[in-house]
Amino acid sequence: MRLLHSVRNDEKTKNMLQELEKDNLQDIIAKNNMVVVQFSATWCGNCRIMKPKVKKLALENDAITFVVADAEKFPESRKLATVDNLPTFATFKNGNFINQVQTNKFDVLKDLVNEVTNN
């Protein structure tokens, strides 16, 4: 039973947490009401630390689309939130940029997510 539950959670997380595979972040933002983007890089240790925390938030907030964007692979996407440090988390609502923070602290990320849902 525990294994099946874990698989279901992974499937749900997969639907809620998207890995950017092409430079289409602008389209994702336009098509979804609320979006939280984690800008990261493979070499970024703090980015790797935050990824499971982002997955946790994705499971808890099914009204929000969470996206992980490799900032080196998709440099144009960085311009949407003026990203200059990693990890950076940016929020968008109804296609508009709301806010961004550069953090490796879960509480700060949670506050950012709450801000987009309450705005």
Annotated model-derived regions:
Residues 19-20, 39, 51-76:
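Thiol-based oxidoreductase modules, predominantly thioredoxin-like and allied folds used
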Residues 13-35, 108-119:
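N-terminal leader/targeting and pre-domain segments
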Residues 81-91:
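Structural micro-motif
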Residues 24-56:
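Local sequence-structure signature of Cys/Sec-based thiol-disulfide redox active-site neighborhoods
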Residues 91-119:
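Non-catalytic, surface beta->alpha helical segment in thiol-disulfide oxidoreductase systems
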